[in-house]
């Protein structure tokens, strides 16, 4: 099977939303996600343009370098597949994430979906999604795609290299 496209999530894969959120509100976003006061912080986070200036996620540059190599040397398409966290601030978050990518010189196409559950709609048997959220990966896999749960760059690179190497050897 030929891998035709790799989708990269942004938050928790390339950029460090979690750290910035914790620095500002002294809580991790995951602990707040299901509580009503998350929306208070969420509004502030968006209105202060925080997505534009997030730090790199540990290993994010290394992962991006390898994915760029796959794009340039093997013709594998690369796109961002990231969530805006809902309709309320969708346009603002999409713009801020584009600013972040532009500031890092990342020119791949950006797909910003309103909710993470929508990511499964991008699944195909020849596409890979690298994402840090278990239910997103489960849904992507169930929809026929190849999901890599990203927790640490070394493991993600091993899985990605294994899939791509298998793909290259199948062409020989």
What are these regions (language model features)?
Residues 75-76, 106, 145:
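Short phosphate-binding/catalytic loops that engage adenosine nucleotides
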Residues 128-160:
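Acidic, Mg2+-coordinating phosphoryl-transfer loop and its flanking beta/alpha structural elements
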Residues 81-127, 135-137:
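Substrate-recognition "cap/lid" segment bordering the active-site pocket of phosphatases
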């Amino acid at each position: 099977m030929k891998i035709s496209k790799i989708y990269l999530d942004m938050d928790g894969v390339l950029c460090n939303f979690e750290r910035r959120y914790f620095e500002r509100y002294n809580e991790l976003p995951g602990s707040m996600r299901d509580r009503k006061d998350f929306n208070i912080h969420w509004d502030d986070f968006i209105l202060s343009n925080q997505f534009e200036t997030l730090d790199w996620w540990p290993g994010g540059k290394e992962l991006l370098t390898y994915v760029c190599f796959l794009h340039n040397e093997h013709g594998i398409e690369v796109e961002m597949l990231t969530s805006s966290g809902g309709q309320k601030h969708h346009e603002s978050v999409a713009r801020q994430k584009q600013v972040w990518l532009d500031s890092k010189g990342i020119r791949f196409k950006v797909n910003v979906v309103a909710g993470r559950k929508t990511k499964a709609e991008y699944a195909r048997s020849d596409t890979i999604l690298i994402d840090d959220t278990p239910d997103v990966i489960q849904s992507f896999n169930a929809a026929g795609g190849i999901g890599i749960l990203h927790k640490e760059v070394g493991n993600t690179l091993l899985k990605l290299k294994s899939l791509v190497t298998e793909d290259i050897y199948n062409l020989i």
